[in-house]
């Protein structure tokens, strides 16, 4: 990636990683690893012709991605559901003697 010092790189992909569904893919550099993943709206997954794990495997074989991860090994696998409604969907996060913070 030709990075120096504390630099990092973020590569974003649209369309192809999620087989044409709303969403895309990402590749982020970390100090000694890469993070590779997909983003897809849950409400679109019922229209998917492939499972999410198959979409990820296909993404890993994409000509723009495969050379970047060649020789790498999987060290962690995770999935997250991320709300899309924005700040207006959040409940009150503070009250008498309580504060909710983080990924609660």
Question: Which functions belong to the PLM regions below?
Answer:
Residues 1-10, 64:
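Central beta-strand plus flanking loop segment that forms part of the substrate or channel wall
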Residues 4, 11-13, 36, 75-77, ...:
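Residue-level signal for well-ordered alpha-helical segments
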Residues 19, 46-104:
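FAD/FMN-dependent oxidoreductases across multiple families
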Residues 9-43, 92-93, 100-102:
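Active-site substrate-recognition segment that forms the wall
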């Amino acid at each position: 990636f030709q990075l120096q010092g504390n630099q990092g790189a973020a590569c974003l992909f649209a369309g192809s990683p999620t087989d044409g569904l709303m969403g895309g893919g990402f590749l982020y550099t970390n100090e000694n690893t890469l993070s590779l993943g997909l983003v897809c709206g849950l409400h679109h997954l019922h229209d998917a012709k492939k499972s999410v794990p198959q979409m990820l495997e296909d993404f890993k074989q994409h000509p723009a991605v495969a050379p970047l991860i060649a020789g790498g090994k999987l060290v962690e696998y995770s999935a997250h559901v991320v709300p899309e409604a924005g700040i207006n969907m959040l409940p009150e996060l503070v009250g008498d003697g309580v504060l909710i913070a983080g990924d609660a």
